[in-house]
């Protein structure tokens, strides 16, 4: 998938360079005709607009490519999830998408950390895998303190796909979090700021001073590169002392890796009807 993504951008980049080459003679002719006499109207602005168009097209193509391989399925608690046929994996637990999100992340991480006292600056939360935006939507009003919510996602879904999942009837903020612009902070409420980043977790810069981590990547057998010692080390270094990380995956190898980088790891009860245990790691 990642190779396909890179190939797409290389292709778009090639088209973009050709388009700029075609555009330059036109800009020069217009300048000679004095149509570009105003100092603010330069070829750079036209190039930027053209570049923006190509990036928008690339982003749309990537979203559609991702969605083509996704099917909506209803989980045991009545809420929907997406199934990725290309990797044979669901975005949420088939035992209950809403149940998993509420228990594993909102209650066991965000509310747990908030109950331990929060400074006037509030909490910074890092999510690994924005997905459908379910975790973000359920976190908006989960605590009565300021929350800066930074979510990393390499393959974004379009809001139209999430609309088909029926979350809007039970989650008032699902539309807002999915419609929020990428790569810029957006105030969903006065206390909740969302920053969705199109980024590769393996190589991007992580926010610092993180208090809560939702580690919600696809399963280790599907994305082993996301569950390495190096990845957990990067997260650990980005967190404040007392920071809390939770994940649905309670495999022994994951627990040992978390411990190895410095976390104190707890095996706690899993969601009703779902996994027997989940992991909570504290720095």
Residue ranges with predicted function:
Residues 20, 25-39:
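N-terminal, intrinsically disordered charge-dense segments
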Residues 114, 118-209, 214, 225-232, ...:
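The AdoMet/dcAdoMet-binding core of the Class I SAM-like
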Residues 242-249:
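Conserved beta-strand signature within the Rossmann-like core of class I S-adenosyl-L-methionine
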Residues 65-123, 140-167:
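Rossmann-like AdoMet
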